[in-house]
């Protein structure tokens, strides 16, 4: 199908080459980036669901609204000296994009604030780096705080002449003591964009359109370097469309992808892994025959190479239809290691899922560009992009250099200006096979065993992961002895807990690690805090050593289950109360959802959805006919999970 949204060209490749050529002949400033990013004024920049309608916003419309709002924001920040950092504390939205460019247009440097960080961490950063103000969609801070809706009010005035802000700053993940701010200027972004032409020529699939359009789901937070560069910058510069979500409910994501014909979405590994696990659980619950049939079809599909698309289109059509439909063209997982079985699942059903690599300090530097499922399922992060160099040294650690790196890094009271000729130590362990790089863990996560050998959690943890658990985290205790911590959430059975202890111990024996790993601990907590992209073993270890991590002793399993069961019933009551907008104290455990509490059919569907998502359970239509009170849901979950 001929594209009509690529300027005067009839294909995306010539359009990309042409636009990069224009950029190469211009100053590498944020002002140039803004002008070029919004130059295809008639192209659709964003789509949102408004009830049953889809609302569309063009690049020209959004550019006009940014220009109209900039004088308003300038007045509100009149006491903030030009050139200062101004924080943006917002979720992904069209308004986030407007605020970003308004801040830059007004002469300030946007600090993209991680909304999952605690107030203490954020306030410490604001104070430490003398941030002038924060634009927020809801939250108030100790510095001047301007609500986004006020900042974006159109003005009849014109913004007085001034230079655009010179850089955008990202927060690295971490604790109060070690959050770094990484600053990217116009030149850094230029080189990230220049990489895209080589990317699409080596990997044409990433430029695939569906029914003449390429639509990127705005799922990854734009405050994260992966979300900003790989989603917003790469696709926004070439005026592709962003689809925004009203919330992050799994059902909303699934429905939005189908409704808008989303073609691309990039996410952290846990998102893809949860989807994979949910699909398998659903098929298993249906019947064993269907599950075996699916596994067999996936194995065949992944063995076919490039021919797998035709096979998957026919044999696995129902799976895709029940998941995201047929519009999906390209997926990237980044931000951590991804389970091989998850790669096999997505590529096996006919979606293209590649593994990628980058860091807050270095930008996005590679992803697997092969079109072959046989290669994609190996989990390689590919080879480096054109403006980046890789080398492996000092214990298989990956070192990176190139002009796509952050121009400077703020660490506490120090500012480190980047020397682009120096190598940056990522501290990531990699192996190289035929020019492709494979991420094998972190050097600072290695545990030195009693025999002097290094234990790599990335290699060992999968060997110890057992059924009915939510993952394993291998850490060192205070004496540097390895401890296998097993996450088991929503468990209401002593038998299940005991079975997990036994299964992990057997797995340790199978891996010949009996003499090395002598302690197994179960926790009811997730290894990742809200908003985290990957497991921080340092944080898990710190919580374990300080006693902050909730652990379950084998001898006290019954006590834990009893406490968890009481909490479960109250959680369900709270869910019902929230859906019906009632005081939880007025909802009885045995109150009938319809007869006593006055719930509607729509309310009940919301309840089923909430319970499914929170407790990862499948509720069939037949089962739901017997679930009408908190107590009935409680009994169902206790016997199912």
Regions found by a protein language model. Give the residues of each.
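Conserved pre-ATP/AMP-binding loop-to-beta segment of ANL
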Residues: 42-44, 153-171, 177-178, 204-215
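Conserved AMP-binding/adenylate-forming
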Residues: 52-57, 72-117, 219, 311-437, 443-446, 460-461
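Conserved AMP-binding A3 loop
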Residues: 58-60, 167-195
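Conserved structural elements of the adenylate-forming
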Residues: 65-71, 182-209
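Conserved AMP-binding/adenylation subdomain of ANL enzymes
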Residues: 193-215, 222-309, 313, 317
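AMP-binding/adenylate-forming catalytic core of the ANL superfamily
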Residues: 392, 396, 427-513, 609
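Conserved C-terminal "lid"/linker of ANL adenylate-forming enzymes
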Residues: 447, 505-562, 585, 608
């Amino acid at each position: 199908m001929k594209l009509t949204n690529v300027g005067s060209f009839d294909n995306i490749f010539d359009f990309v080459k042409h636009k990069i050529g224009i950029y190469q002949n211009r100053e590498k400033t944020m002002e140039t980036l803004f002008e070029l990013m919004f130059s295809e004024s008639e192209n659709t920049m964003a789509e949102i669901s408004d009830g049953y309608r889809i609302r569309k916003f063009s690049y020209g419309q959004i550019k006009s609204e940014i220009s109209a709002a900039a004088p308003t924001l300038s007045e509100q920040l009149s006491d903030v000296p030009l050139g200062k950092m101004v924080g943006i504390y917002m979720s992904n939205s069209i308004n986030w994009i407007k605020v970003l460019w308004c801040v830059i247009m007004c002469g300030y440097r946007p600090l993209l604030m991680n909304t999952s960080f605690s107030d203490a961490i954020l306030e410490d950063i604001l104070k430490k780096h003398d941030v002038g103000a924060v634009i927020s969609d809801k939250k108030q801070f100790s510095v001047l705080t301007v609500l986004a809706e006020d900042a974006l009010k159109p003005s009849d005035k014109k913004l007085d002449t001034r230079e655009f802000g010179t850089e955008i700053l990202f927060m690295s993940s971490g604790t109060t003591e070690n959050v770094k701010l990484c600053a990217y200027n116009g030149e850094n972004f230029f080189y990230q964009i220049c990489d895209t032409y080589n990317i699409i020529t080596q990997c044409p699939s990433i430029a695939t359109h569906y029914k003449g359009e390429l639509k990127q789901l705005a799922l990854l937070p734009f405050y994260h370097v992966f979300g900003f560069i790989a989603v917003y910058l790469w696709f926004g510069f070439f005026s592709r469309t962003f689809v925004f979500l009203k919330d992050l409910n799994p059902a909303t994501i699934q429905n939005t992808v189908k409704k808008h014909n989303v073609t691309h979405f990039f996410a952290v590994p846990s998102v893809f892994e949860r989807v994979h696990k949910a699909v398998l659980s659903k098929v298993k619950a249906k019947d064993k025959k269907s599950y075996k049939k699916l596994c067999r079809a996936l194995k065949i599909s992944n063995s076919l190479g490039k021919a797998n698309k035709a096979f998957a289109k026919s044999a696995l059509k129902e799976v895709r239809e029940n998941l995201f439909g047929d519009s999906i063209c390209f997926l990237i997982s980044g931000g951590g290691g991804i389970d091989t079985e998850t790669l096999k699942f997505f590529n096996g059903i006919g979606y293209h899922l590649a593994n990628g690599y980058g860091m807050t300090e270095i930008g996005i530097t590679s992803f697997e560009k092969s079109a072959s499922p046989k290669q994609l399922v190996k989990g390689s992060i590919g080879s480096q992009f054109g403006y980046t160099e890789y080398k492996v040294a000092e214990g298989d650690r990956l070192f990176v250099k190139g002009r796509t790196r952050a121009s400077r890094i703020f660490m506490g009271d120090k500012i480190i200006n980047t020397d682009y000729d120096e190598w940056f130590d990522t501290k990531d362990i990699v192996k190289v096979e035929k020019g492709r790089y494979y991420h094998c863990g972190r050097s600072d996560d290695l545990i030195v065993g009693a025999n002097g050998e290094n234990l790599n959690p990335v290699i060992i943890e999968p060997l110890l992961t057992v059924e009915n658990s939510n993952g394993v985290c291998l850490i060192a205790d205070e004496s540097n002895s390895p401890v296998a911590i097993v996450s088991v959430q929503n468990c209401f059975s002593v038998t299940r807990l005991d079975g997990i202890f036994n299964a992990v111990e057997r797995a340790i024996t199978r891996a010949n690690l009996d003499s090395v790993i002598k302690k197994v601990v179960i926790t009811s907590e997730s290894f990742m805090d809200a908003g985290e992209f990957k497991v921080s073993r340092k944080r898990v270890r710190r919580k374990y050593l300080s006693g902050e991590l909730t652990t379950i002793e084998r001898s006290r399993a019954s006590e834990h289950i009893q406490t968890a069961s009481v909490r479960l019933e109250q959680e369900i009551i709270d869910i019902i109360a929230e859906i019906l907008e009632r005081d939880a104290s007025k909802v009885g455990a045995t109150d009938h959802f319809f007869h006593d509490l006055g719930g509607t059919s729509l309310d009940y569907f919301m309840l089923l959805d909430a319970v499914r998502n929170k407790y990862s359970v499948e509720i069939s239509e037949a089962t739901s006919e017997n679930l009408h009170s908190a107590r009935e849901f409680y009994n169902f979950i206790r016997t199912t999970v």
